[in-house]
Amino acid sequence: MLALLGNVIAVDDPPLAVPADIRRPDEGVVISRGTRVYLRTFTRRDLAWLTEWVDDPYLERMVGSEFLHAFKHDWDKGPGFHDAVMSDPTQVVLIVEAYRGWTKPVGVVRLFNIHMLEGYAFLETIITDPRAIRRGYGVEAGKLISYYGVDVLGVRRIEAKVYAYNVLSMNSLRRNGFHQEGVLRQAGFDGTLYWDVVVFGILKDEIEAVRKRDKVYLPLDEPEGNVIEPT
């Protein structure tokens, strides 16, 4: 999918204020930079991180990610998963990297179930490192990929679903301008109990309002540049 997007540019300069001796070399192509995190393409080497994340019971309960579920159960954590993801025209998967000395990715963010004709997609943001929680990384990653969705994919609406007990994720969505649009009663199951799933949505003009408010842009615009931050 990303290979077909000829107007995506790589940003090769290393993040500022990060000592070279503690910074992991970049992998993949940087798609978007914010003030706290940057988003890069999903590479085969990232399968090692996915292997670690899919066995985290806390992430499973808080996210219930179909992306991680498919990697573990449909592909048996195999290398073919990467090729399947990259050739899937209905999703864009990006890895979340944080500045200031982090030695591994802090999560993954994606737009999925992309409907180009109708102009809408679904958002999933997973912050996987407990040390990265409550630092605004998930909030900014969600903003950056939303801007990407508007600028590159041309979407006009983005939806997200969150378990009702994941208050932090709901607050993160609201900070990004999402509006609660409904509740799917007892649509989620955590292995023991059924839970409500809360539906959020945001429109293109609302995404643009957030961008103007926060002054965080895609490199394409300005060279300077279930959703989750678990509690």
List each model region and its residues.
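Sparse recognition of residues in long alpha-helices and their boundaries
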Residues: E66-F67, L94, F189, V216
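Conserved GNAT-fold acetyl-CoA-binding loop/helix
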Residues: Y58-F81
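Short, well-ordered amphipathic alpha-helices
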Residues: P79-G80, V96-E97, S146
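Acyl-donor (CoA/ACP) binding surface of acyl/acetyltransferases
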Residues: M1-L47, E52-D55, R100-T231
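Hydrophobic residues in alpha-helical segments
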Residues: V54, V63, V85-M86
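Short, hydrophobic secondary-structure boundary micro-motifs
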Residues: E60-V63, V93-L94, V210
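Generic structural signal for secondary-structure transition and capping sites
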Residues: L47, Y58-L59, T90-Q91
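A short helix-loop-beta-strand connector motif used in the catalytic cores of GNAT acetyltransferases and
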Residues: H69, F81-I95
